[in-house]
Amino acid sequence: MENTPLWRQGWYQFAGQLASPNFGPRPSQAEIDLIVLHCISLPPGQYGGDEVQRLFTNQLDWNAHPYFKSIEGMEVSSHFYIRRQGELQQFVSCNQRAWHAGVSSYRGRNNCNDNAIGIELEGVDDTTFDERQYETLVSLCASIVQRYPITQIAGHQHIAPGRKTDPGRGFDWPLLQQALGLSEQFFPAGVLLKSLC
């Protein structure tokens, strides 16, 4: 893919860059057609620190909080992370395979990391998200849809049901769909019926 004013080798020019070592090449025939939305905060429910960035760059002090012992040794990443105030950071080039989906399947295809771009929102899956996060998310998703052949946007809960619950009931799917102007077919069945916020 050629570079554009907004994209340089899969790096989005409106995101702060903090490179993660946790990535690999996508399979040669993979088509980047899925956006997966997640939420995360470390420790859970606490916002504003740098623990998520440290996790994604393998620099988290496992002894800094009791919760961290339960995730000790994890090597994970996401392409993007949106803070509560809307700040956007990128950890992995979208042309590469980030490690965000885990064991997953969506619409007949397994291993969603192969064809997905992962976006983490700072938050927990039983609360709502900040308006500034939605503003950043809409802008980012619009740019991704223009750049890559995206046909699907789903939550971690949809690609790993029973194992994951994020971004959760507090995420406003109708808001995202309306702001992007995409058809219902882009989204998981049922999420656009009503806002659960």
Where on the chain are the PLM-derived regions?
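Basic/polar, cationic surfaces and motifs that engage anionic cell-wall
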Residues: 2-13, 110-116, 124-197
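Internal catalytic-core helix/loop-beta-alpha segment
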Residues: 88, 116-121
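Conserved, mostly hydrophobic/aromatic
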Residues: 37, 119, 137
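Short, functionally important structural connectors and interaction interfaces within domains
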Residues: 83-84, 104, 121, 163, ...
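N-terminal catalytic cores of peptidoglycan-degrading enzymes
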Residues: 1-110
